[in-house]
Each structure stands twice: as structure tokens, then as C-alpha cells.
């Protein structure tokens, strides 16, 4: 098909769909806007349904390790060499020898030797080896050599308490194994894996074994029930397909005794009529294995609307399907931070119909892979989350070129770099508990993107204060959200105010009404009668001329869980 005929066909289709009288700007939403709006709703849904990852921290963050200052003692012995034995089972990167070498050339007495051993012991504890000991055997220090023995702390066994439930597989979820070094990080990871299922509670105690350095790990594992039900209600839909959206979710917790999680969620527009409506279905399954987690999420969405055409109403319908395979591994953790590597494979397809006839030029089938790093850092009482990811479009799984590729306008073989960060800082003012929350997202690319991969701002999931019926969309962009929340005297409830700002740019930026939005929000959220709620109102602070939106954007989210 030549570019001329392609342009004529697309122009004819889009003219019928988006040629809307100015007075009814919010009545109908263009297909691109509808698709992006649904992607944001789906992303928010999956984030809400995913259980929060528990943070198990069994030891306090270590103090800064400085150079040892040895005391002056009498009598003392000049130490020329420090010999460490028994450290072979420990990782080679542990700086025990480097710490010990600080004693070279020093004249040490009993206090100095104990100080050296204490510093080495503290470093072992800081790295999680809490039952490994550093000992000084009887020796003659007149030789100038100080001998130190490391007694590795090992696990004799991992057992459940007699009153624990038995429907759990420790081998896959708990990386600490009998016969291996006792590492507190392995235990923390195992407890997080066991408690990733919200209906499970797990804790442990360490009991010394009969042999030196041996320890038994005794776990108490309880599961209240294996299923949960959830229902949701919000007004996050669009006027063209139904503003009020409802949904129901069935969770199966630990169905295969692998600390696994499964859910299926269905929903759609509540005020469904013959001329407009939405339907969505999402399924998810994931399970941990030691420091690894694997999962799969699949979703299907369709919407329909009657669009006013030149010669009568036109029935427009869209369908989309998404499948994501997820694999992650925790690379590093200590008492105050952890870093996770993620790898995703994504597929997406969509079709659009006019009066039950497919618009073939709008058919899309794409695939991509994505790698990323996620980091969490506990800084005193504050929590910092930061992440970076790189996404590359592929031709896997029958993916087809985007129509824009034939004319060099865009490509499904995208290269996208994304950054995200969140900082939450609690503080107290006049005996009142408050917190400041900062969120930041950025997307960068050097390839022209199809609309489904572009960055959008304006709405409850990006720059608040806008109703989401219209957004600014481009290849690149960023937004920042600032909230100050006040924990009300009534437990479980919070009042918050926020100010947001965002910008977009890139290839399509020249065709937009503007490049930036700023908005504000005020709301109250909390939990009552097993229902999480969020009631809010927002107002635009800055927008381009001609960018039409409500002067006041109000909304709500209700999520009930049983």
C-alpha cells in the first residue's frame, strides 16, 4: 500500500472518530488516548493487586568502620605478622585479613588483641555471619606472630515448630540449608519469601547445637487461609466508555505449598450500555526460589463506544492483550539496603473495529525484552527506592512491524530507558506525625516511538489535578510528585496535599498544544471495615492554552478485601 493510500485511509478513519464538536470535548476519546489510558489503568491495577514485599531486617545497620586505634599497654608484644586460620569456608571478599593487618608493627597487650578480635567479629556480624567466632588460642607472642582462629558458624538443621502448619516447602522458599554457613541474609530472604503471601506469618529462633559453631533454625509458619476475595470501585474510567469502574479478584495464596501466589481479576464499566462499556480480565502467578522470583501476568481488555459520525453513529471497538514473563534475582542485601535485578519479556497485541470491520492499519503485535535494577535503601527512618530499566523491541512471538515503520515515522523496535525514584521521609511537628513523599519518573529514547510506548502526563497516575480525558503524549518525558501527609489522630487515616509537575518532548512535541503540566491535589486515605479508600480533589495549576480539562478533578478509589 503506498503512503498516499495509507494516509487517506487513516485520515478517513480518524476523522470520523476524533472530529468532535468543541463543546463536547470530553464525550469521546480518541483511540490512541483510550489505549494509553487503559495501559495506565492496567499498570495501576497490577501494582495494587501485587502484595507488598515484606522487609525483614534482623540486624541494625552497622556503624562506620574506622581504623583501629590501639591502646598503649604494659606489658605488650610487637606484632609483625597475623595468621588467620579456619576462614576458608567464608567468602574470599571478607576483609578479615585486611582488618587484622592493622596490628602489624603495633605493640599489643590483652586489650589491644581483644579490640582487634572485636573489630573482626563486628565485621562478620555486619555481613550476616552472626554465629561465626574469632578466637585467640594459647600462643607465645614473643615470636612476633599473632595467631587467630575463625570458627565458622554453620546450620545443623532447619525445622518447623510442632505447632506450625505443614503445607509449606522450605527447600524452594528458604535459601538457608543444613550444613552451610549461617548467614543472616539467607534467613532474612527466606522469611521474606515465606511472608510474601499476605495470609502467612513466619518467624524464627536460633538455638545453639551440640557441636561448637552449630545452630538450629526453628521456624514457626502459620497460614490463616488459602484464599482471599477483593472488590474495587473507582471513577478512573473515561466518559466515552464509562467513568465508574468496578472489579472483583480471587486470590489463591500458597496453592502449591511453594509460597506461590495466584490471582484472577475481572472488571469493567458499571454503567454499561449498548453504546459504551469496557471489560478487562487479568491473571497472575508467581513463586520464589531462594533469591530468585519468577512470574507471569496476562491481561485482556476491550472497550466499545458509539462515536458521532457525519452520517450517524459509528460503533467503535478496541481489543488488546498483554502477556509478561518476569524473572528477578536479589543481587545484594545487608542490614540497610538491597538491590534486585529484573528481566522481563513482553508481548502486546491490539485490534480496532469500526462497525465490526477491523481497521487493519491499526492492528499491532509487538514484543520486547526489558532488564532493570531496583534498589531500596533504609536511611535512618527514611526509605529510598530507585530503579533503572532498559527496554528493547523485538520481532519475537510473531511480532509484526508497526505501520509507521514503512514510512520512517516510528518503530516498534524501540530502545527506551526509564528511571524511577521514590523517597519517603517521616517527621514530627508539634507532636503530630507527618511524612514527605517524593516520586519521580523519566523516560528517554533515541528512537521514534509508537503511541503505545510513548510517555504521557495528566491524570491521577502522573500529574494530578487533571481529569485524564486529555493528556500530553510524546516520546520522552518526566514527572515529579510531592506529597505531605498528616497521620490523623484516628489510627489508619491520613490527610495529604500534593503538587505535581511534568514535561514531555521529542519528535512529536512540536505538534502538541504545549509541553508541560502542573497540578495539585488534596485528599484523605485510609482503611476502615477492611476497605482501603482514597478520596481526593485536584486542580490544574498550569496548562497550555487550548488544553481542555475540568477546573476541578475529583475522584475516589475503594478497595475491599476479605
Swiss-Prot record:
Keywords: Cell outer membrane, Ion transport, Membrane, Porin, Protein transport, Transmembrane, Transmembrane beta strand, Transport. Its main location: membrane. Residues 77-153 form the POTRA domain. This is Outer membrane transporter CdiB. Potential outer membrane protein component of a toxin-immunity protein module, which functions as a cellular contact-dependent growth inhibition (CDI) system. CDI modules allow bacteria to communicate with and inhibit the growth of closely related neighboring bacteria in a contact-dependent fashion. This protein may be required for secretion and assembly of the CdiA toxin protein. Probable member of a two partner secretion pathway (TPS) in which it mediates the secretion of CdiA. It comes from the Bacteria. GO terms for biological process: monoatomic ion transport; protein secretion by the type V secretion system. The keyword Transport applies. The keyword Acyltransferase does not apply. It holds the Pfam family POTRA_3. It comes from Yersinia pestis. One of its GO terms (cellular component) is pore complex. One of its GO terms (molecular function) is porin activity. Belongs to the TPS (TC 1.B.20) family. It is found in: Cell outer membrane.
Amino acid at each position: 500500500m503506498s503512503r498516499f493510500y495509507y494516509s487517506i485511509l487513516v485520515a478517513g478513519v480518524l476523522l470520523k472518530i476524533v472530529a468532535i464538536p468543541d463543546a463536547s470535548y470530553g464525550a469521546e476519546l480518541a483511540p490512541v488516548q483510550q489505549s494509553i489510558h487503559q495501559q495506565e489503568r492496567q499498570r495501576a491495577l497490577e501494582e495494587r493487586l501485587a502484595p507488598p514485599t515484606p522487609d525483614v531486617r534482623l540486624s541494625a545497620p552497622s556503624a562506620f568502620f574506622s581504623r583501629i586505634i590501639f591502646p598503649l599497654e604494659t606489658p605488650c608484644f610487637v606484632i609483625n605478622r597475623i595468621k588467620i586460620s579456619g576462614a576458608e569456608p567464608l567468602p574470599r571478599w571478607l576483609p578479615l585479613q585486611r582488618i587484622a593487618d592493622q596490628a602489624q608493627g603495633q605493640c599489643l597487650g590483652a586489650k589491644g588483641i581483644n579490640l582487634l578480635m572485636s573489630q573482626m567479629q563486628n565485621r562478620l556480624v555486619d555481613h550476616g555471619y552472626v554465629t561465626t567466632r574469632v578466637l585467640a588460642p594459647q600462643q607465645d607472642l614473643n615470636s612476633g606472630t599473632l595467631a587467630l582462629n575463625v570458627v565458622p558458624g554453620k546450620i545443623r538443621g532447619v525445622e518447623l515448630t510442632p505447632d506450625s502448619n505443614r503445607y509449606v516447602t522450605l527447600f524452594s522458599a528458604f535459601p538457608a540449608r543444613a550444613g552451610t554457613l549461617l548467614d543472616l541474609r539467607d534467613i532474612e530472604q527466606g522469611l521474606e519469601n515465606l511472608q510474601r503471601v499476605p495470609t502467612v506469618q513466619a518467624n524464627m529462633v536460633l538455638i545453639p547445637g551440640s557441636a561448637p559453631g552449630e545452630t538450629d533454625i526453628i521456624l514457626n509458619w502459620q497460614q490463616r487461609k488459602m484464599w482471599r476475595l477483593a472488590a474495587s470501585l473507582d471513577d478512573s474510567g473515561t466518559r466515552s466508555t464509562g467513568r465508574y469502574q468496578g472489579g472483583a479478584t480471587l486470590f489463591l495464596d500458597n496453592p502449591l505449598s511453594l509460597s506461590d501466589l495466584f490471582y484472577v481479576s475481572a472488571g469493567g464499566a458499571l454503567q454499561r450500555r449498548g453504546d459504551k462499556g469496557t471489560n478487562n480480565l487479568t491473571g497472575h502467578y508467581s513463586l520464589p526460589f531462594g533469591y530468585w522470583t519468577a512470574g507471569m501476568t496476562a491481561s485482556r481488555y476491550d472497550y466499545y463506544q458509539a462515536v458521532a459520525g457525519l452520517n450517524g453513529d459509528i460503533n467503535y471497538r478496541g481489543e488488546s492483550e498483554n502477556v509478561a514473563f518476569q524473572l528477578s534475582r536479589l543481587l545484594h542485601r545487608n542490614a540497610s539496603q538491597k538491590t534486585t535485578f529484573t528481566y522481563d519479556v513482553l508481548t502486546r497485541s491490539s485490534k480496532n473495529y469500526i462497525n465490526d470491520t477491523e481497521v487493519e492499519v491499526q492492528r499491532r503485535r509487538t514484543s520486547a525484552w526489558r532488564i532493570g535494577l531496583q534498589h531500596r535503601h533504609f536511611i535512618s527512618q527514611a526509605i529510598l527506592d530507585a530503579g533503572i530499566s532498559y527496554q528493547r523491541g523485538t520481532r519475537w512471538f510473531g511480532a509484526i512491524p508497526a505501520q509507521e515503520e514503512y514510512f520512517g515515522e516510528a518503530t516498534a523496535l524501540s530502545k527506551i530507558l526509564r528511571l524511577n525514584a521514590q523517597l519517603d521521609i517521616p517527621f514530627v511537628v508539634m507532636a503530630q506525625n507527618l511524612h514527605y513523599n517524593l516520586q519521580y519518573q523519566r523516560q528517554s529514547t533515541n528512537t521514534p516511538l509508537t503511541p503505545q510506548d510513548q510517555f504521557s502526563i495528566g491524570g491521577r497516575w502522573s500529574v494530578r489535578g487533571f481529569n485524564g480525558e486529555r493528556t500530553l503524549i510524546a516520546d520522552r518525558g518526566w514527572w515529579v510528585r510531592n506529597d505531605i501527609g498528616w497521620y490523623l489522630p484516628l489510627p489508619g487515616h491520613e490527610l495529604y496535599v500534593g503538587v505535581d509537575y511534568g514535561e514531555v518532548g521529542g519528535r512529536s512535541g512540536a505538534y502538541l498544544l504545549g509541553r508541560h503540566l502542573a497540578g495539585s491535589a488534596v485528599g484523605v486515605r485510609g482503611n476502615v471495615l477492611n476497605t482501603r479508600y482514597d478520596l481526593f480533589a485536584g486542580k490544574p495549576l498550569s496548562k497550555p492554552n487550548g488544553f481542555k480539562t475540568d477546573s476541578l478533578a475529583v475522584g475516589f478509589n475503594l478497595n475491599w478485601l476479605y
